[in-house]
A protein has these predicted regions:
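Juxtamembrane intracellular "pre-TM" segments in multi-pass secondary transporters
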Residues: 2-6, 187-217
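Extracytoplasmic
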Residues: 11-45, 66, 230-235
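Helix-breaking motifs and short loop linkers at transmembrane-helix boundaries and internal kinks
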Residues: 42, 74, 95-101, 112, ...
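Conserved MFS/SLC helix-loop-helix module at the cytosolic interface between two early adjacent transmembrane helices
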Residues: 61-100
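Paired small-residue
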Residues: 85-92, 100-108, 306-312
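Helix-loop-helix hairpin linking two adjacent transmembrane segments in secondary transporters
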Residues: 101, 130, 138-186
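Cytoplasmic helix-loop-helix junction between adjacent transmembrane helices
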Residues: 105-146
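A late C-terminal transmembrane helix in Major Facilitator Superfamily
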Residues: 327-365, 369, 374-375
């Protein structure tokens, strides 16, 4: 384990947060520009939800390659290579002559930033364990929330004053700066002597055979799928249904995100006081409450800012509680397979979110009920996954006692 000193922790966290921020900003920065982009490419506004799906699916799938590869050759070269792929995709998006080319560019972008999804979980496990690991994961979760806060507001400002293309110009510049920062200042967290050359399928079988890991993976997939579906749908509901201007959409879009920050902060504080099971229950309860808040007005055919944004705020609190807690508990048992475990977590989580947003894009984008229904289903899946985890723990205790 390459333990980070307290003096280096700040730099380590800063570099990790801006590295993750590239992928997160790319996911949501275009949302306020959806009406303008739809007009430019001659497609329905609802079709722009496919941009997020085209981004998230390779973002998830690529992590299955990045994780085991990083266990073999180290974290740093994988991180830098992924950023280069992202920059190529961003250039293509900037000059895309058609909607199909934009989708291809989003696919390449997601394939590149998938490295941040895998490595964000892996490098923290390289350097920390136990309570320190949960603390660092919570700090990272709180830190990275500022990029989704900034992205829609900045995207709305840029698209309103400079056109939607300026969003991709910004992403290109920001991505280039982060790549240079990683090349210059980010040290390798996996020493040569700790690297593993075993076959990929052996690593995956070892990680996936853990019953509790299976439960936490499902929990994270469902939680993030709900978040991503809201991000893909809210812009259409606020901009195309309620006819709000891009600036207003961008500000409303970020209102739920402090809920995630609050949940992440609470997850770290409450874990020591209440214990794992109670913290996970609180997160699950918040997800259910937020989903119900959104679906009830939708059942009456209504789309209201209060229920949509208020329900999402509560849902995001639950997500903020669950993400650092479930990630830490899932990856904790795998100090020598951190890359593979991180890849499975990030890969399946984002693949599931991509498929959920793809399914949402096929539904009516004019209905708040559809969004509430998806969030409700995701919350129920989280409940079932936590039940699975509890039963697995009892099963393991029974085996040890026999």
């Amino acid at each position: 384990m390459v333990k980070q000193s307290s003096s280096n922790m700040g730099k380590f966290l800063f570099l990790l947060i801006i590295f993750i921020a590239v992928g997160q900003m790319t996911q949501t920065m275009y949302v306020p520009a959806i009406p303008e982009m739809a007009t430019f490419f001659g497609v329905r506004a609802a079709s722009l939800q496919a941009v997020m799906a085209a981004y998230l699916i390779p973002y998830g799938l690529s992590q299955f390659v990045y994780g085991p590869l990083s266990d073999r050759i180290g974290r740093r070269p994988v991180m830098i290579s992924g950023m280069v792929i992202f920059l190529i995709g961003t250039v293509i998006a900037l000059v895309a002559p058609s909607f199909d080319v934009l989708l291809l560019a989003s696919f390449i972008q997601g394939m590149g930033t998938g490295t941040s999804g895998a490595m964000s979980r892996t490098v923290t496990r390289d350097c920390y364990d136990g309570d320190d690991l949960h603390k660092v994961n919570s700090l990272v979760s709180m830190g990275v929330i500022f990029s989704p806060l900034i992205a829609p507001v900045l995207g709305g400002y840029l698209s309103e004053h400079l056109g939607w293309e300026s969003i991709y110009i910004f992403l290109l510049g920001f991505g280039a700066l982060v790549t240079l920062a990683l090349m210059r200042s980010f040290g390798e967290t996996l020493p040569v002597e700790n690297r593993r050359a075993e076959r990929v399928w052996v690593s995956y079988r070892y990680v996936l055979s853990n019953r509790r890991f299976q439960g936490y993976v499902v929990c994270l997939i469902a939680t993030f799928a709900g978040v991503a579906t809201f991000e893909a749908s809210a812009g259409v509901l606020l901009g195309s249904v309620l006819k709000l201007d891009p600036s207003t959409v961008s500000w409303l879009f970020i209102v739920p995100l402090p809920g995630y920050l609050l949940g992440s902060w609470g997850s770290n504080k409450l874990m020591k006081r209440l214990g794992t099971n109670r913290v996970l229950f609180l997160g699950m309860f918040a997800l259910l409450t937020g989903a119900i808040t959104i679906i009830i007005p939708g059942m009456e055919g209504l789309v209201t800012v209060t229920s949509l944004i208020g329900g999402a705020f509560i849902y995001f609190i639950g997500a903020g509680v669950l993400f650092p807690a479930a990630t830490t508990l899932a990856i904790q048992p795998f100090p020598h397979h951190a890359g593979t475990a991180g890849a499975v977590l990030g890969g399946l989580q984002n693949l599931g979110a991509g498929l959920a947003t793809l399914a949402a894009s096929a539904m009516s984008a004019q209905s708040q009920f559809n969004l509430g229904a998806v969030l409700s289903v995701m919350a129920i899946i989280v409940v079932l996954s936590l039940v699975w985890i509890r039963r697995s723990e009892k099963h393991d205790i029974t085996i040890l006692a026999s």
